[in-house]
Amino acid sequence: MEEYKDTLNLNTTTFSMKGNLSVNEPKTYAKWQEQQVFKRMQNRKDNHGDFTLHDGPPYANGHLHLGHALNKILKDIVVKREYFKGNKIYYTPGWDCHGLPIEQQILERLEKEKTSLENPTLFREKCRDHAKKFLEIQKNEFLQLGVLGDFEDPYKTMDFKFEASIYRALVEVAKKGLLKERHKPIYWSYACESALAEAEVEYKMKKSPSIFVAFGLKKESLEKLKVKKASLVIWTTTPWTLYANVAIALKKDAIYALTQKGYLVAKALHEKLAALGVVDSEIAHEFNANDLEYLKASNPLNQRDSLITLGEHVGLEDGTGAVHTAPGHGEEDYYLGLRYNLEVLMSVDEKGCYDEGIIHNQLLDESYLGEHVFKAQKRIIEQLGDSLLLEQEIEHSYPYCWRTHKPVIYRATTQWFILMDEPFIQNDGSQKTLREVALDAIEKVEFVPSSGKNRLKTMIENRPDWCLSRQRKWGVPLAFFIDKRTNKPCFESEVLEHVAHLFEKKGCDVWWESSVKDLLPPSYQEDATHYEKVMHILDVWFDSGSTFKAVLEDYHGEKGQSPSDVILEGSDQHRGWFQSSLLIGCVLNNQAPFKKVITHGFIVDEKGEKMSKSKGNVVSLDNLLKKHGSDVVRLWVAFNDYQNDLRVSQTFFIQTEQHYKKFRNTLKFLLANFSDMDLKNLERSHNFSPLDHFILEALETISVGVNSAFEEHDFVKGLNVLMAFVTNELSGIYLDACKDSLYCDSKNNEKRQAIQMVLLATASKLCYFLAPILTHTIEEVLEHSQVLCAFLQAKDVFDLKDISVSEKLHLKEFKKPENFEAVLALRSAFNEELDRLKKEGVIKNSLECAIEVKEKALRENLVEELLMVSFVGIAKEKLSETPAFTLFKAPFYKCPRCWRFKSELENTPCKRCEEVLKER
C-alpha cells in the first residue's frame, strides 16, 4: 500500500502546527512598527466611515500588569474590528503623567539617598524623567501585546502643549462662573498631606470606637424646658472630632424622650438604647424637636457651648437621633453651619495632628499638641469621664486614600471647587446647573453593559462639588493671580491667555521658576506687587478629564472626532475618568465627550479573590507572554465575559490554549488542502455538491451571528458561535466527509475543486473574524498561503475585508440538501452502532461497512459521504418494524490507495483510483 502514498494529494503547508508565539510575535510586531502599519491603516483609500476610540490614559508609573493588558487588548480588538469593517480608525494612546504616585517614588528615592530637594523645579524635573522612563517601558510592553495605535505620537499630559490645553480648559470653567475658592471640609489624606477628590477615595472596612456621650443642657435651656436635669445623648465613631463640636442636630418634628435619669434621645430609638444600657427605660417627659431648637448644651470635653439645631440629614434608624456637629470636619455639618451661622473650628494640621489652634481656642489641653488624631482618641474617650455612657468597637465602611491605602479625615481647608449646582449659560442661551447638564447628557450616551448608565447617573446626582486643588508640586498649577487689593482671583482674558501661551512655550514649570511680574502680560506688570500666585496644583482627574479637548478638539479632527464614538475602561472609572470627562465636556460643550461607554471588570484569581502580592496570587503578565504568547492572552480576553470580573490562573490559560490550537489546526488543514489550487480556478463558477451547500449555508448563518455579537462588543458570544461551527459542522461533519475527495480524487477533479473553493471561503471568513483578536496568527496564515491572498486580493492581514461568500463563489443561493436532518439523525444512530462493533472487534473503521437504509428519499451519495462507508443501498421494502438501517460488511475488497472497500479484485485499486492513476 505504501507504493500508492505518493499518488495521493497529501498536500502540506509551511504554516506550522506550533505557533511558537513567544519567539515569532516580537518579530512580527517589530516589522509592523518599522512599516508604520497604523498609518497605512488610517490611509487606506476605501475607508467609508470614521471611528474614534478615545484612550483613557494609564498612569506612567511601574510595569504593566494583567489589568492593563485586559484594557488595551479590548480597545485594540474594538478598533481593529472597526478597521476591518472598512472604517477609518483613530486611536491615540496616551499617558497620565502628573500626580502623587510619581511624587512618592521620587520622595522615597531621595529619602534613600538621604538628600532633600526643596527646589520645586528640580523636583518636577525628576518627576518628569521618571514619567518619561516608564512611559517608554509601558509603550514597549503594550506593543508586545500586538496593540496598534498612534504610538509614534501618543499624548502625554506633561507635554507643554497638553499642559496649556489643560489650563485653557480650567480657564473656561472659571469664565463660566463655576470655579470658586471656598473654606469647607473636604477629604484629606494625611499620608499624602493633600486634599482628595471623591474619585480618589475608596471604602474599606475599618474598626473604630463607637461612643455615646451626654451633653448636659445649659441652665437657661433647662429653665425653658422646665426640667431640673437633661442631657442630649449623641453617638459618634470619630471621638477625635468632639473638640470641634459647636452644635447638635435633631430631626425636625420628631419626638424626643427625656428619661427619668435625665437623658434626652429620640423616642423612636429609646427602647433600643435602653436595651443597650445607654439610657434608663422610664420616660419622664416628651418634647417636639422644634421646641428644642436654639437651646444650648455643653461640650463635656471643653465646656464650650453646643447649639441645638434641626437638620434634614438626621435619621432615626440608628444612633440617638441627636447628631454631633463639627462644621470643620464634616460636609453635612458644614452646610448646617451655614444655615445657623456656626463657627468652623479646625485645628488639625496637614499630617493629621492637632495644631496650636487647640490651645488658642481652648479646645483641648496642651498635651494633645502634635498628637495624631487617631492616636489621641483613647485619651479623649477617657477624658469624657461620666459623660461617656457607652463605649464599643464597631467595624464599618470608612473612606481610605486610594494611593496610600491609609484612612482619610474630613478637614476644613481653603480649596478650589467646581460648583455642581451653580447655573451657567448654555450654548442655546438658557441656564442650567452642571449637575442638570450632566444628567441630561447621560441620557444620550449608550452604555455597555446598560447598568453603567444608572450607576453613573446616581453618582452625578449625589456627588458634591468637585475639589480641584491639591497641595503638591507635580502637576498643572491652578495658575491664577489673587489681587491682594480685593482678595479675589484675576480672571481677565488677557492675563489668562498670556499664562496659557507661556505654558505652551515653556511648560508650566515656569509658574515656579518666574516671578509674578514675569508671568503677567506687559500691561499688568506695573501692578505686579498687587498680585500673588496661587500655588496649588490641579487634581490629576482634571488632567485626564480634559484629554478629549487636548487630543481630539485641539487637533481639529486629525486625531479623531469629538465626541468620540467609544471610551472603554474598567468599571471603577464611573467614579473617576468617566465622571471627570463628562463634567468637563458638559462645561465646555454642554454635552458628553463620548457617544458610548464600555466597561470591563477586574482581574481576580481562580477563586474570585482580588490579586495581591501579600496573598501570593498575582499572575505575571510577562510570564504569561513568555509561556503562551500574546495571541493566546488576547484570545483569553476575548473568550471571557469581560463585563464581569475575569478569573485567571494557569488552568484558564491552558483552556484558552486549547481553543487557540483548535483554530490554528483548522486553518492549517484548510491551507494545506487548497494549496495546490490553480489560481485560474478562483474566478470561475463551480458545481457545488449538496454537502458543499450545507456547509456554505452554515457558514452564512454563523457569519450573521458572529457579526451581530461582535457589533455589540460581545466577543465571547461571537467566538462561541465560531468555535461551535468549527468543531461541529466544519470539523465534525464537512471536513471528515471531504477527505476522500481531497486526498484521492484527481487534482483537477471538479468535485475536489469545488470543495477547495468552499475551504477557501471558510478560511476567509475565519481570518476575517479572528483578525482583530489573533492579528499575528492571521498575518502568519496569509504569509503562508499565496492562494488565500489571491482569493482575498490581500497581501497581508491589513488588507483583509469581509467577503460575500455567495458573490465570491458565483452562487445566487445556498441549497441545503433535502432530508439533510434525517441523514444527520441516521449518522448519529450509525455512529453508535459503529462504536459497538468496534468495541466487539467486528470492524476497525467505517470504511469496512456497507449500509442499507429503508428511507428511499435519502440520497445514497450523501449518506455514503457523511457516514464514510463503502456502500449504500436502499431497502426494497419499507416495513415499520424494521430498523432505520441495516449494517453489514462491505461486499468488495479494500482499495490499497483510498482504503474504501470498492475494489473488485484483491490488492488492486478501485475504479475511481484506477482512473486517477491513468491521468497521472
From Swiss-Prot:
The Gene Ontology biological process terms listed for this entry are: isoleucyl-tRNA aminoacylation
InterPro entries in the record: aa-tRNA-synth_I_CS (IPR001412), aa-tRNA-synth_Ia (IPR002300), Anticodon_Ile_BEm (IPR033708), Ile-tRNA-ligase (IPR002301), Ile-tRNA-ligase_type1 (IPR023585), Ile-tRNA_ligase (IPR050081), M/V/L/I-tRNA-synth_anticd-bd (IPR013155), Rossmann-like_a/b/a_fold (IPR014729)
Q: Does the keyword Nuclease apply?
A: no
**Residues that hold ATP according to the record:** K613
Top EC group: ligase
Where, subcellularly, is it found?
Cytoplasm
Its required cofactor(s), as named, are: Zn(2+)
Q: Where is this motif: 'KMSKS' region?
A: 610-614
**Cofactor note as given:** Binds 1 zinc ion per subunit.
**Molecular function per GO:** aminoacyl-tRNA deacylase activity; ATP binding; isoleucine-tRNA ligase activity; tRNA binding; zinc ion binding
Annotated Zn(2+) binding sites:
C895, C898, C910, C913
| Residues the record lists as binding L-isoleucyl-5'-AMP | E569
Known catalytic reactions: tRNA(Ile) + L-isoleucine + ATP = L-isoleucyl-tRNA(Ile) + AMP + diphosphate
Positions occupied by motif 'HIGH' region: 58-68
The record's keywords, sorted A to Z, are: Aminoacyl-tRNA synthetase, ATP-binding, Cytoplasm, Ligase, Metal-binding, Nucleotide-binding, Protein biosynthesis, Zinc
CDD domains from the xrefs? Anticodon_Ia_Ile_BEm, IleRS_core
As recorded in UniProt, its EC number(s) are 6.1.1.5
Q: Which HAMAP family match?
A: Ile_tRNA_synth_type1
User: What the record says about its domains?
Assistant: IleRS has two distinct active sites: one for aminoacylation and one for editing. The misactivated valine is translocated from the active site to the editing site, which sterically excludes the correctly activated isoleucine. The single editing site contains two valyl binding pockets, one specific for each substrate (Val-AMP or Val-tRNA(Ile)).
Q: What does this protein do, in the record's words?
A: Catalyzes the attachment of isoleucine to tRNA(Ile). As IleRS can inadvertently accommodate and process structurally similar amino acids such as valine, to avoid such errors it has two additional distinct tRNA(Ile)-dependent editing activities. One activity is designated as 'pretransfer' editing and involves the hydrolysis of activated Val-AMP. The other activity is designated 'posttransfer' editing and involves deacylation of mischarged Val-tRNA(Ile).
Q: What is this protein called?
A: Isoleucine--tRNA ligase
User: What phylogenetic lineage does the species belong to?
Assistant: Bacteria, Pseudomonadati, Campylobacterota, Epsilonproteobacteria, Campylobacterales
Gene (name only): ileS
